[in-house]
Amino acid sequence: MANFLKKMIENDKKELRRLEKIADKIDAHASAMEQLSDEQLREKTDEFKARYQKGETLDELLPEAFAVVREAAKRVLGLFPYRVQLMGGIVLHDGNIPEMRTGEGKTLTATMPVYLNALSGEGVHVVTVNEYLATRDSNEMGELYNFLGLSVGLNINSKSSDEKREAYNCDITYSTNNELGFDYLRDNMVVYRSQMVQRPLNYAIVDEVDSILIDEARTPLIISGQAEKSTALYTRADNFVKRLKEDEDYKIDIQSKTIGLTEAGIEKAEQTFGLDNLYDIENTALTHHLDQALRANYIMLLDIDYVVQDNKVLIVDQFTGRIMDGRRYSDGLHQAIEAKEGVEIEDETKTMATITFQNYFRMYKKLAGMTGTAKTEEEEFREIYNIQVIQIPTNRPIIRDDRPDLLYPTLESKFNAVVEDIKERYHKGQPVLVGTVAVETSELLSDKLNAAKIPHEVLNAKNHFKEAEIIMNAGQKGAVTIATNMAGRGTDIKLGLGVLELGGLAVIGTERHESRRIDNQLRGRAGRQGDPGVSQFYLSLEDDLMKRFGSERIKTFLERMNVQEEDAVIQSKMFTRQVESAQKRVEGNNYDTRKNVLQYDDVMREQREVIYAQRQEVIMEENDLSDVLMGMVKRTIGRVVDSHTQLEKEEWNLDGIVDFAASTLVHEDTISKKDLENKSAEEIKDYLVARAQEVFEEKSQQLNGQEQLLEFEKVVILRVVDTKWTDHIDAMDQLRQSVGLRAYGQNNPLVEYQTEGYSMYNNMVGSIEYEVTRLFMKSEIRQNVQREQVAQGQAEHPETEQDAAAQSNTSAKRQPVRVDKKVGRNDLCPCGSGKKFKNCHGRNA
């Protein structure tokens, strides 16, 4: 381990030496750039583009291009990037992460690699965590890029499709991570090429990269449509679980945040709902509603996981503390919370398209990111995204005083001490930023400060719209600001007059977060660019982290020291090590979970990429899809004939082939059993393909010209692909939940998921080709046929990381079962074989 760390440190030093050399080359161009007029400086952009087109690489253009941006920034913004910012810019261009401390000017650092990579004409995306930052940076930095002759676009939720398309076609596009992901999904749901907005994904710089690629990595973006399910069952399930008692009727595992009924709870459910067996197949819907009602009532907490405003349940982002407008928990959890809170229950939704940030951002040709806290997650960035983390030195030494943690026995004694500390600093005039992990805590502390007559501002999910204004004033003399995790990331807290003499900004943490990174972000609000500052964390044995991990040893330690007073306080290196050890364990668990989820997600990623690529080929086709369509017809015929001719020739099911031909390929009674006798299997295939070709030609002639034929082909293919794909997403989701239970049978759930997922995908492809064949060959031709989306979807927020963990560990004794409508004996088998049900899967029914 020691050798590994030594090697890493040596590599960092070597990389810094390389960056210094390139920075020297940039510096060498400074005086020449200073001599140029504004017009000459602007003309450099066209010169660079021409040199790039002639074969010069971006790496070769870098020193001069960075020098141009540096000089332009001085003239337009009044800012001249320091050497450390040049080094950070080089790291970003290389597709890595420069770890730069708060206040070191990451926004300005990004302008140089953004400009350089925009010269290729393939587009650069600058990604921020919220629309405020995207709008601010596109306006402020846009002046610089416009001065240099580059176009800048802003992509936010309120933009129309035309405005989004225009923004994506700019040289540089500012956007939020959510909007990029949703636009990608929407582009793969449209039915006309003209409706697409994105270009191929080229180069992205992700601001606050740890927040997006680590904290939100497992968060899937979901486009959903309405599913037809009754909301009454949510109310019944909610009424039932509210009467249950913990430990007697249900049990909660605090560490994994899972919940399940006990035997007594199951018996109560069976009595209440009049059932013999709660986990019978017919009761799948009820068990699902009960599971979600349990989680809604006893796992999901008001003012922590969500808030209720204007009679609506609104999700609170666990990592930023912001309300996530327009987002809903999926899989019925949101409806269960609505039932719990007594607000109107909205219709349940069905997933139509989904992708995680991990898989979206891995599609870029080159990916880079910026943050002040990435080194603790360096392994994850390297393993999953193939990105290195390089620590960039600060422009000035950090003189902030980071004090050891203070431990109190109870929450009450801890908060009393916090209020006393704030009161003392307030009367002195020193500005204070207090970090809390939840809305609930910020409001509790606010009440205590009101009682102590200390004026203050509260920044949490309930008033996030005032964020910029609150943070702007947080460094003024006598300011007291309480903030949840977001703490105004991306917005600098600038110190007011006279604050330096008072010791700078004081940061107080009211408890440790699960991640050391989030704690470091809070500390980093103070002491920017060599300013003085102080940080202090207050902890109690009743904090969530302490209850979940390692508090027993600390309790023993307190007993040994005979600490009994309510307001006793401890500062100890042993205690600090315990806390950091607990945090490392949580970080390790979370990383393992994210890695595991990614392995599952990769199965869907491969399938999604194939489907989306084929879908795009159909939409982009401008001449003819007849070969594609006839290819589907031939493969469908091949599959059906093979399935009916597997046995000895005397036992071939020729009746089944005739049934298939009549229902799917040709007019009824045009092919008989006699036509197929005395032919080999290959000859039967050729015969059916020839007859299908005749019908195909006949259909083609019914349409007025090649253009209408192409349009009809697109309508048929897109409609079938979209319907089958959304069903497949649901089926894969159910498979994923069910394979988790197979671990009990000594089977590897991931291998089972990969194997069955591959089989289900092949079945879906066969089903698509069968349905396209049937629809094209048997449908009535209409002249005015138009493409339509299968359903109109809306963006939906999935459950958070903790919820996902809980879902994957559900302790109920059932597997999701897909119940289809009843099939008649003489109907075609729904498997797509073309046989009658009685001759196929219904043979043993």
Curated annotation (Swiss-Prot):
Cofactor note: May bind 1 zinc ion per subunit.
Binding site for ATP: 85, 103-107, 492
UniProt topology in membrane: Peripheral membrane protein
EC numbers, comma separated: 7.4.2.8
Region (Disordered), start-end ranges: 787-845
A GO MF term: ATP binding
Class of this enzyme: translocase
Pfam (any one): SecA_DEAD
InterPro entries: Helicase_ATP-bd, Helicase_C-like, P-loop_NTPase, SEC_C_motif, SecA, SecA_CS, SecA_DEAD, SecA_motor_DEAD
Substrates-to-products reaction catalysed: ATP + H2O + cellular proteinSide 1 = ADP + phosphate + cellular proteinSide 2
Predominant cellular place of this UniProt entry's protein: membrane
Transmembrane segments: none
Cofactor(s) of this protein: Zn(2+)
Binding site for Zn(2+): 829, 831, 840-841
GO BP term, example: protein import
Gene Ontology cellular component terms for the protein in this record: cell envelope Sec protein transport complex; cytosol; plasma membrane
Cellular compartment(s): Cell membrane; Cytoplasm
CDD domains, alphabetized: DEXDc_SecA, SF2_C_secA
Bias-annotated ranges (Basic residues): 835-845
Oligomeric form and interacting partners: Monomer and homodimer. Part of the essential Sec protein translocation apparatus which comprises SecA, SecYEG and auxiliary proteins SecDF. Other proteins may also be involved.
NCBIfam families referenced in this protein's UniProt entry, alphabetically: PRK09200.1, PRK12904.1, secA
Role according to the record: Part of the Sec protein translocase complex. Interacts with the SecYEG preprotein conducting channel. Has a central role in coupling the hydrolysis of ATP to the transfer of proteins into and across the cell membrane, serving as an ATP-driven molecular motor driving the stepwise translocation of polypeptide chains across the membrane.
Homology family: Belongs to the SecA family.
Annotated protein name in UniProt: Protein translocase subunit SecA
Species name: Enterococcus faecalis (strain ATCC 700802 / V583)
Gene that encodes it: secA
